[in-house]
Amino acid sequence: CVDEMVADVFGFNAVQLGLPEHDFLRASRIPFKCRVAPAGPAALRARLRDLPIASNSIDLLLLPHVLEFSVNPHQILREVQRVLMPEGHAVIVCFNPRSLWGVRRAFNRVPDAYPWDGHFIALPRLKDWLALLELEITGGRMGCYVPPFAQNTWIQRCRFMEAAGDRWWPI
């Protein structure tokens, strides 16, 4: 899903904020790619609320589940606005509280375990935040319709839900 979103973005500089253990920019054709995180195997270790990146310098900025686990997601979005070039692209990946994952989170017995300890952000709220920063939404995609099962067998049995999701459960 993320591979499709970053594959055709043109530019020279791409940055992934957070989750440095995973290379979500692997499908990007942009020549310079960097992972930034406060800890872990990141090429650049930095606080995401205060990026050591020049203003208007990034063509593609990827935020995989960063906002849900931030103390101040508004500040991170302000940094996104600052470092993105004009006509740059930000790909924001979030858990939807109005999904099967959100329902699972609401009834979770272990609330301090990842990803259930995050603050899932509803799409209308995210749209409001982006509008306040005058960031234009040019596209969007929902995904991960399969319920959050622990057993791979159940995940495979429910794989059909991915194809049906956008058609029958639009948000």
Regions found by a protein language model. Name each.
Residues 49-61:
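A short acidic, Gly/Pro-enriched loop at the edge of an enzyme's catalytic core
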Residues 89-117:
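Conserved class I S-adenosyl-L-methionine
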Residues 4-51:
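Class I SAM-dependent methyltransferase SAM/SAH-binding core
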Residues 117-140:
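Short alpha-helix
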Residues 59-74:
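A short SAM/SAH-binding and catalytic strip from SAM-dependent methyltransferases
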Residues 74-89:
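A short glycine-rich, Lys/Arg-flanked "PGG" loop and its adjoining helix->strand segment in the class I
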Residues 142-171:
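A C-terminal cap/extension of S-adenosyl-L-methionine-dependent methyltransferases
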